[in-house]
């Protein structure tokens, strides 16, 4: 392993497959597999997580979509599950609103909740670099300001006691917001973002009260914070570009799995996306840069000595189509199937995994 001063070798394996639709369709299927032998970077406990995400268009012209997500994990033999369904719409060019509900369960405990909130963006990105599909560090959407209202039914004594204790804690100390920032998940995230130059503000609890509901008391909280969405690098923006709401004329879906143990980390992703290719003019279409090895690109930006990459990419074009330009150049071709591995492609992947940038572009046509 090559993180945090270790002298061991890190080996990252990745295998990507992109299958494109014909005509002017921007849709495509993406299959990704990544495996890294990174014991020191793994959690102390084995983790097993599955994610299912469905995005359904309600009014694509207005960016109105419904997202359904299920997250299931097993950590230290305890099964956890989070189910969420939310409707998201663009209220203005800078403001998105969302309303949803969900359920969380940990072991034998389960509970429902509802939420509504908004995100305000200072600016959106639409740079020429993104359109050209050149993997430079592209900023996403600028700084984002969140205003979230949470409602949790207090339908048992344990929850009521916990809620009353939380209300009392906020009323008796001014450091409660610091506690949220430092000890909740936002703590590690806050540190990581700051070290990467992506400034975020602490989470502030602006409201915490109890209301009466049809079945009893309801705990209501309002959370406000901002984060540096502008600090996201190109690999993340590629994932976002795979979901353009104006192209979402049918449901999109993703199934993913994450496994970690003492031997390393493994990720599997299978998805059908509406934004795998874009019109490049002159009868050409451009394949969006396949999301760079997620674990390697984001999990390996540390101090490492030895680092090996074993990466492959397969692109399957619609029947009758050909690649007109590719950088890095593909290694082999069989009819509409093209493959990349080794050589310039491997050097490009390793360069990106170490924090560098470089050209990746595929143009195809009939």
Curated annotation (Swiss-Prot):
The keyword Magnesium applies. Bacteriochlorophyll a 3 binds at residue 298. Bacteriochlorophyll a 7 binds at residue 297. One of its GO terms (biological process) is photosynthesis. GO terms for molecular function: bacteriochlorophyll binding; metal ion binding. Bacteriochlorophyll a 4 binds at residue 290. Keywords: Bacteriochlorophyll, Chlorophyll, Chromophore, Electron transport, Magnesium, Metal-binding, Photosynthesis, Reaction center, Transport. Pfam families: BChl_A (PF02327). InterPro entries: BChl_A (IPR003426), Chl_A_sf (IPR036559). Homotrimer. Each subunit contains 7 molecules of bacteriochlorophyll a. Intermediary in the transfer of excitation energy from the chlorophyll to the reaction centers. This is Bacteriochlorophyll a protein. It comes from Chlorobaculum tepidum (strain ATCC 49652 / DSM 12025 / NBRC 103806 / TLS). The lineage of its organism: Bacteria, Pseudomonadati, Chlorobiota, Chlorobiia, Chlorobiales. The gene is fmoA.
């Amino acid at each position: 392993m090559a993180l945090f001063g270790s002298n061991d070798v890190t080996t990252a394996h990745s295998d990507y497959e992109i299958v494109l639709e014909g005509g002017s369709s921007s849709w495509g299927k993406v299959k990704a597999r990544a495996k890294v032998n990174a014991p020191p970077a793994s959690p102390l406990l084995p983790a097993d997580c599955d994610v299912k995400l469905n995005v359904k268009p309600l009014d694509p012209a207005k960016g109105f979509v419904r997202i359904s997500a299920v997250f299931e994990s097993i950590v230290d033999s305890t099964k956890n599950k989070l189910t969420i369904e939310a409707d998201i719409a663009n209220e203005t060019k800078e403001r998105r609103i969302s309303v949803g509900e969900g359920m969380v369960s940990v072991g034998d405990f389960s509970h429902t909740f509802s939420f509504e909130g908004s995100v305000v963006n200072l600016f959106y990105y639409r740079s020429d670099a993104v359109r050209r599909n050149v993997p430079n560090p592209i900023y996403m959407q600028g700084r984002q300001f969140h205003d979230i209202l949470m409602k949790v039914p207090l339908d048992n004594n344990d929850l009521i006691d916990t809620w009353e204790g939380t209300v009392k804690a906020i009323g008796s100390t001014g450091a409660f917001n610091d506690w949220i920032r430092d000890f909740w998940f936002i703590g590690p995230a806050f540190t990581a973002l700051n070290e990467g130059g992506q400034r975020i503000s602490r989470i502030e609890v602006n409201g915490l009260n109890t209301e009466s509901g049809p079945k009893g008391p309801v705990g209501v909280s309002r959370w406000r914070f901002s984060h540096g969405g502008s600090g996201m690098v190109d690999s993340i923006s590629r994932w976002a570009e795979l979901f353009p709401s104006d192209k979402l004329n049918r449901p999109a879906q993703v199934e993913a799995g994450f496994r970690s143990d003492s031997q390393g980390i493994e990720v599997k992703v299978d998805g059908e996306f509406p934004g795998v290719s874009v019109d490049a003019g002159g009868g050409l279409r451009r394949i969006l840069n396949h999301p760079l090895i997620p674990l390697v690109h984001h999990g390996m930006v540390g101090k490492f000595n030895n680092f090996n990459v074993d990466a492959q990419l397969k692109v399957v074009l619609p029947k009758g189509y050909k690649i007109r330009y590719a950088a890095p150049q593909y290694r082999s071709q069989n009819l509409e199937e093209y493959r990349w591995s080794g050589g310039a492609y491997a050097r490009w992947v390793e360069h990106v995994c170490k924090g560098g940038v470089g050209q990746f572009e595929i143009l195809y046509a009939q």
